[in-house]
Amino acid sequence: MRCSRNGFTLIELMIVVIIIAALAAMVAPNLIGRADEAKEKIAEGDLAKLKIALDLYRLDKGSYPTSEQGLATLTVPRGPGQEPYLDKPALDPWKRKYLYRFPATHRSYGYDLSSMGRDGKEGTEDDIKNWE
């Protein structure tokens, strides 16, 4: 009488688990850093889009919005039957408002525009800004 073998032995299952754990340990550090890097690239792209909207505003109005008006003024329709410069208020990838100042304090012309970055604190090295 022959004994048929069904399923895997405990040793075989343990080897598979060890292999999967080793692969995860090698891949995970690369994936974790990529999410933050992707958010930084999105913020840089957002700053470029905001620059276009601000430049269009300046062409229409003769000046950039004041710091008090802020970026929110870009979501107001330009005039009767006209679309706003932005469809919705601009939030960075960390769901915080972009910082806007006009006149600029970090540049000799124009405006300052920045995201506080991952840490949410202004003036730290992870900030994404339109100067430097």
Write out the residue ranges for each language-model feature.
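Short, contiguous, well-ordered secondary-structure segments
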Residues: 1-2, 108
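Short, contiguous strand/loop micro-motifs
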Residues: 3, 40-41, 78
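Conserved amphipathic alpha-helical interaction elements at protein-protein interfaces in regulatory
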Residues: 3, 33, 37, 56-60
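N-terminal single-pass transmembrane signal-anchor helix
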Residues: 4-31
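Residue-level recognition of hydrophobic positions within alpha-helical transmembrane segments
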Residues: 8, 40-42, 51, 123
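Generic secondary-structure boundary signal with a strong preference for alpha-helix termini
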Residues: 19, 33-36, 107-108, 131
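Aliphatic-rich helix starts adjacent to a transmembrane/signal segment
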Residues: 30-49
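Low-complexity, acidic interaction segments enriched in glycine
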Residues: 48, 52-132
